[in-house]
């Protein structure tokens, strides 16, 4: 079969890998100038390694991507440091990533520590999750952890992550995040871009046709009598394919496919998501040298973060990965999740840099703006799905109502959170589904 894959991110490349190995002809249509999607990197002229546009790491439990890494001969490039995760408490940076650190956390007494540890252990080791999706994370966490722990830890994180939707997110999503986390975090020699490049070359080596700067514009059934298949327009040209897999956002599928209608269309249009805005700073000095913090969760008290820190997380990458790979720069990400219509998507880089850099002295009183050697800004309007109550009923099927057309997006990996591991998983899952359907799809093509 001739198969088109819309999007050459991790999901698209993973699907292509399996489909090509099964003997099919695969064309990947990518609107960007490089493969990898949100896992792509960029490189300053001083650096040995490229850096992710949006911060990335793996957990030791990420079996899908680790399995693929092994298959393509890249396992020796994957390593797992043990960085420090901290929180801001009463204007101090406090490590908060192990039972010992929970005990010494100044906001908890011994009863709080026992309760926090017991509930967290339950979420970490329990497996059934469907009952949890009947409850919002806001209500469940408050009830089970108690008001004090909830207000100190979970509520600020939910607000920071989901903004105006924080009281809608179901508890199964939070369970999934806690269930798979590991203290050691995985990274690749050469960054995630090295993994993307390796997977891209494997796909090309199997015969995959990857077309960059070639955004998809329209997908429609071939309307000729007994023709079957799909007409895919990309880069101003229309080609016929036996099947197509869309690995971008559900909203883009709706725009690309005017023939999509009925319950499926209503289902994908009802899905909510948050965008991501990340400013990366190359600093002359470390911002969080005293605590050697990699990941700092910043408490948010309101969805608009008014009067507080204007982003969700500070990620000092070079407290995780040696800065010698980055020309001795200290790499700092300022990251936030915001609604797709948020002003951050229209503000200039200079405006956002003034806003973000203007609060960094709160985390290190010695910080001065002239520490910033260079900055970069990356934005994505579709980055974090918002799973509401009973979300499993709202997930679109991988098969769309249009024969031969499939959707494989981050909105369908629920209850798991978005990330490269689940991009690999859903990419390979949709490929196996398409292979299962191949007989009927090939039959239609033969009849034509």
Predicted ranges, named:
Residues 92, 104, 108, 117-229:
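Active-site/ligand-binding neighborhood in enzyme catalytic cores
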Residues 1-28:
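N-terminal Rossmann-like FAD-binding beta1-loop-alpha1 element of flavoenzymes
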């Amino acid at each position: 079969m001739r198969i088109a894959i819309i999007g050459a991110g991790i999901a698209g490349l993973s699907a292509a890998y399996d489909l090509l190995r099964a003997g099919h002809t695969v064309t990947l249509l990518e609107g960007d100038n490089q493969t990898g999607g949100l896992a792509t990197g960029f490189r300053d002229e001083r650096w040995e390694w490229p850096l992710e546009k949006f911060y990335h790491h793996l957990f030791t439990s990420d079996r899908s991507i680790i399995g693929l890494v092994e298959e393509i001969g890249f396992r020796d490039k994957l390593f797992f440091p043990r960085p420090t995760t901290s929180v801001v408490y009463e204007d101090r940076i406090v490590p908060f990533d192990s039972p010992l650190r929970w005990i010494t956390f100044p906001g908890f007494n011994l009863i709080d520590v026992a309760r926090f540890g017991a509930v967290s252990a339950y979420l970490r080791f329990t497996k059934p999750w469907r009952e949890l999706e009947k409850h919002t994370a806001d209500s469940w966490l408050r009830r089970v952890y108690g008001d004090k722990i909830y207000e100190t830890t979970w509520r600020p994180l939910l607000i920071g992550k989901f903004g105006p939707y924080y009281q809608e997110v179901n508890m199964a999503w939070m369970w999934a995040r806690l269930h798979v986390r590991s203290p050691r975090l995985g990274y690749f020699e050469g960054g995630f871009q090295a993994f993307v490049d390796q997977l891209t070359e494997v796909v090309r080596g199997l015969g995959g046709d990857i077309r960059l700067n070639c955004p998809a514009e329209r997908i429609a059934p071939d309307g000729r009598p007994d023709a079957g298949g799909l007409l895919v327009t990309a880069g101003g040209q229309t080609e016929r394919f036996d099947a197509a897999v869309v690995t971008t956002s559900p909203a883009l599928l709706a725009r690309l496919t005017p023939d999509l209608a009925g319950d499926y269309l209503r289902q994908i249009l009802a899905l909510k998501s948050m965008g991501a805005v990340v400013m990366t700073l190359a600093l002359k000095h470390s911002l969080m040298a005293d605590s050697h913090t990699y990941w700092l969760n910043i408490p948010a008290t309101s969805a608009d973060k008014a009067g507080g820190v204007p982003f969700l997380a500070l990620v000092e990458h070079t407290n995780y990965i040696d800065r010698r790979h980055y020309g001795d720069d200290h790499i700092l990400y300022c990251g936030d999740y915001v609604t797709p219509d948020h002003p951050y998507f229209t503000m200039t880089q200079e405006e956002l840099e003034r806003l973000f850099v203007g609060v960094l002295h709160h985390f290190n009183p010695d910080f001065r703006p002239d520490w910033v050697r260079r900055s970069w800004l990356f934005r994505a309007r579709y980055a974090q799905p918002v799973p509401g109550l009973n979300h499993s009923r709202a997930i679109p099927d991988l098969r769309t109502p249009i024969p031969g057309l499939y959707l494989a997006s981050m909105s369908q990996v629920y209850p798991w959170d978005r990330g490269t591991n689940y991009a690999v998983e859903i990419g390979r899952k949709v490929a196996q589904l398409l292979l299962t359907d191949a007989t009927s799809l090939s039959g239609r093509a033969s009849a034509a």
